[in-house]
């Protein structure tokens, strides 16, 4: 992230008992990037403090939390010092941004996980990451690009957002579940 290069050099370790092994926070008093990891077969939930513990200073504004990895997901606006739950999927890392200043992202959505394919002004392209059989209320959530219109699968939608339903049958089990043990065999 070129736009945050100047603050990413200031890092500190987070307490392992709260944030897991090798958890780090980088940034300044207004914007922090927090890295968490999970090297187990089960989803791990970390309780992230949106305050001094992660290096964020109080300025009277709400704290915006946005997950950036393994996908982008808006986690909402919260009070300074409050705690949010961040789930880290098995064998994954998570990158969380918390900030109490105006959003620098060019494109920002809420209501659904997504990836940005292209964020160039005039033609941003976003891949929505919904699960089969699920419905989502997708909203344009600020960012530095003003939208006049948007298309989802070639259909025009209003700039206030849209309901999106993904085709297919809703999953009965988690897609990241441990299926079974592997047996050794001769080759």
Give, region by region, the residue ranges found by the protein language model.
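Non-catalytic carbohydrate-binding regions of carbohydrate-active enzymes
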Residues: 1-13
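C-terminal beta-sandwich/jelly-roll accessory domains of carbohydrate-active enzymes
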Residues: 11, 16-17, 29, 36-187
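Glycine-rich, charged/polar anion/phosphate-binding loops
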Residues: 19-21
């Amino acid at each position: 992230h070129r736009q945050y290069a100047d603050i990413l050099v200031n890092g500190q370790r987070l307490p392992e008992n709260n944030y897991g092994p090798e958890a780090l926070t980088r940034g300044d008093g207004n914007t922090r990037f927090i890295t968490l990891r999970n090297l187990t077969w089960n989803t791990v939930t970390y309780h992230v403090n949106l305050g001094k513990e992660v290096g964020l200073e109080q300025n009277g504004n709400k704290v915006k939390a946005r997950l950036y990895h393994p996908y982008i997901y808006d986690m909402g606006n919260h009070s300074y010092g409050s705690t949010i739950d961040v789930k880290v999927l098995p064998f994954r890392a998570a990158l969380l941004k918390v900030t109490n200043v105006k959003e620098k992202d060019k494109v920002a959505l809420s209501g659904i996980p997504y990836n940005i394919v292209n964020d160039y002004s005039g033609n941003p392209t976003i891949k929505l990451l919904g699960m089969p059989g699920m419905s989502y209320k997708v909203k344009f959530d600020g960012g530095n690009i003003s939208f006049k219109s948007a298309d989802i699968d070639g259909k025009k939608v209003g700039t206030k957002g849209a309901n999106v339903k993904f085709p297919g049958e809703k999953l009965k089990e988690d897609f990241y579940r441990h299926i079974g043990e592997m047996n050794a065999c001769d080759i």
